[in-house]
From Swiss-Prot:
The gene is gmhA. Its EC number is 5.3.1.28. Homotetramer. PROSITE patterns: SIS (PS51464). This is Phosphoheptose isomerase. It comes from Pseudomonas fluorescens (strain SBW25). Residues 36-197 form the SIS domain. CDD domains: SIS_GmhA (cd05006). The lineage of its organism: Bacteria, Pseudomonadati, Pseudomonadota, Gammaproteobacteria, Pseudomonadales. Keywords: Carbohydrate metabolism, Cytoplasm, Isomerase, Metal-binding, Zinc. Its main location: cytoplasm. Substrate binds at N51, G52, G53, E64, N93, D94, S119, T120, S121, S124, Q174. InterPro entries: GmhA/DiaA, Phosphoheptose_Isoase, SIS_dom, SIS_dom_sf, SIS_GmhA/DiaA_subfam. Gene3D superfamilies: Glucose-6-phosphate isomerase like protein, domain 1. One of its GO terms (biological process) is carbohydrate metabolic process.
Length: 197
């Protein structure tokens, strides 16, 4: 197969996955946006975490809220737990890599805050511990997962929201996660500041 054919094949696979996910995920993305808006209206904040590409997604979400998405508006409180290398490495060294997010959540999380927990497999041990810590702090969890939801899915409480991409290929799951994050940012902005024509 020549390279351009492979590129077209990858584009088509991404398009197909997004089309399959659209109707399945729309109600969950809507619900997650409402949970986040409710938290923000009640002086809560967003914490986010993930590993690898999902860490990048956590940072992307946080930056869109703190800075701006597609319009001028006030900054919104959001912290990506993936950015402080000194904190992450000290926790990993002194305790365990599995605690790099949970220890931060126990310090920073407050009742009514929201944790955006991202894992394509749903089985990342440090994300599972982050969810447990968020529940201990009376936070609501929005979980971005894929495949069968993994161990994360079984931890979620009725007030939590899972956005599970119906796919098994990591790259396709990540692509839908990014689109879901952009949808969340758009919906948060429109609910807080009104729709832009």
């Amino acid at each position: 197969m020549d390279m351009q054919s492979r590129i077209r094949q990858l584009f088509q696979a991404s398009i197909d996955t997004k089309q399959q996910a659209m109707d399945v995920l729309a109600p969950h993305i809507e619900q997650a946006s409402q949970v986040m808006v409710n938290a923000l209206l009640n002086e809560g904040k967003m914490l986010s975490c993930g590993n690898g590409g999902s860490a990048g997604d956590a940072q992307h979400f946080s930056s869109e809220l703190l800075n701006r998405f597609e319009r001028e508006r006030p900054s919104l409180p959001a912290i990506a737990l993936t950015t402080d290398s000194s904190t992450i490495t000290s926790i990993a060294n002194d305790y365990s890599y599995n605690e790099i997010f949970s220890k931060q959540i126990r310090a920073l999380g407050q009742p009514g805050d929201v944790l955006l927990a991202i894992s394509t497999s749903g089985n990342s041990a440090n994300i599972i511990q982050a969810i447990q810590a968020a529940h201990d702090r009376e936070m609501i969890v929005v979980a971005l997962t894929g495949r069968d939801g993994g161990g994360m899915a079984s931890l979620l409480l009725p007030e939590d929201v899972e956005i599970r991409v119906p796919a098994n290929v990591t790259a396709r799951i990540q692509e839908v996660h990014l689109l879901a994050i952009h949808c969340l940012c758009d919906l948060i902005d429109s609910q807080l500041f009104g729709s832009e024509e």
